[in-house]
Design a protein with these regions (language model features):
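A short, glycine- and basic residue-enriched loop/turn
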Residues: 44-45, 110, 272-273
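Conserved HGGG/HGGXW glycine-rich cap/lid loop of the alpha/beta-hydrolase fold
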Residues: 27-71
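Flexible "cap/lid" subdomain of the alpha/beta-hydrolase fold that forms the substrate-access gate
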Residues: 2-15, 19-25, 34, 62, ...
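Short amphipathic alpha-helical segment that frequently serves as the phosphate-/nucleotide-binding helix
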Residues: 42, 255, 285
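ASCE P-loop NTPase motor core, strongest for the SF2 helicase catalytic module
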Residues: 48-49, 101, 284
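Catalytic histidine-centered segment of alpha/beta-hydrolase-like enzymes
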Residues: 272-285
């Protein structure tokens, strides 16, 4: 697919009422299977902008902004993972998605795994990268020791609030550091826009505190263990992308997990950290399109 074709692709922005708030989403494509794109922290549907155009000629694509992110509403809620589940479930019911392929990264994978564990009959396939999984100890989290210390600080009362809410550290430092290329001023402006105030950044703060590490938080850890068990038992097609060295998922970890999944294809993207969509959008998009061809 050429750059001109990508630029000519029509991504339509829509908005629906969900649980007393609103959720914004990108939509493209009119024929083929439903494909749901789920982003992570602190991004939005914007991160799929150069991937969806590869897929939309053969699929109906939907990329929501999670509640509290992007152009979606910011209701007065705790923004725990359970809240994200409630709003995503209601969003999918509102727009009428039933059977679907899910493409996910970061916290989008935790949402995808949890949805697939509860509704396996609705899953046509699952493509994912840099995924959330239960980590028995901090050595299992991230490829860089300094990142582990940083996320410990995010989870520390007072320190996390100062760094993420007041200093906007996740947007200004974590995001650009986890992309191999330099994000443009326009791209950074798009990612900054949803979070102009400390209060607006609460959703960003809550996700690091929900990471299932060393048995905590207990409810999240138990849920993620159950969801991983369901994922290993499932036989729907899977497509696992990984970068080198990766962030949450190294090439070695990706290979190990893939060997424990049924019907899982591995795709090596080359140099990359966490936000692989920003470094390899066209490779990811083309691979998803070819994979969906095999599904249908």
């Amino acid at each position: 697919m050429t750059l001109q074709t990508i630029q000519e692709s029509k991504l339509t922005r829509r908005e629906v009422e969900v649980l007393g708030s609103t959720m914004s989403y990108l939509q493209a494509g009119t024929e083929g299977p439903n494909v749901l794109f789920l982003h992570g922290n602190p991004t939005s549907s914007y991160i799929w902008r150069d991937i969806i155009p590869h897929v939309e000629p053969q699929a109906k694509c939907f990329a929501p902004d999670l509640i509290g992110f992007g152009r979606s509403g910011k209701p007065d809620i705790d923004y725990r993972f359970a809240d994200q589940v409630r709003y995503l479930d209601a969003f999918l019911e509102t727009i009428g998605l039933n059977k679907m392929v899910i493409v996910a990264q970061d916290w989008g994978t935790a949402l995808a795994f949890h949805y697939a564990a509860r509704f396996p009959e609705k899953i046509l396939g699952l493509a994912f990268m840099e995924f959330i999984h239960p980590m028995p100890n901090w050595d299992n989290f991230h490829q860089r020791p300094e990142a582990r210390e940083l996320f410990k600080a995010f989870r520390t009362p007072g320190m996390g609030e100062k760094m993420i809410l007041e200093d906007n550290f996740f947007i200004e430092r974590v995001l650009p550091a986890a992309v191999t290329r330099k994000l443009s001023d326009a791209e950074m402006a798009e990612y900054r826009a949803p979070f102009p105030t400390p209060q607006s950044r609460k959703p960003i703060l809550m996700f690091p505190r929900e990471l299932p590490i060393a048995g905590e938080p207990r409810d999240m850890y138990a849920m993620c263990e159950d969801d991983q068990a369901a994922l290993r038992a499932s036989n729907y097609p899977k497509l696992l992308f990984y970068g080198d060295p990766g962030a949450l998922i190294s090439p070695e970890v990706a290979t190990r997990f893939a060997s424990g999944f049924q019907n899982c294809q591995l795709v090596r993207l080359g140099t990359g950290s966490h936000y692989l969509q920003e470094d390899h959008p066209h490779t990811i998009g083309a691979a998803i399109r070819q994979w969906i061809d095999l599904l249908i």
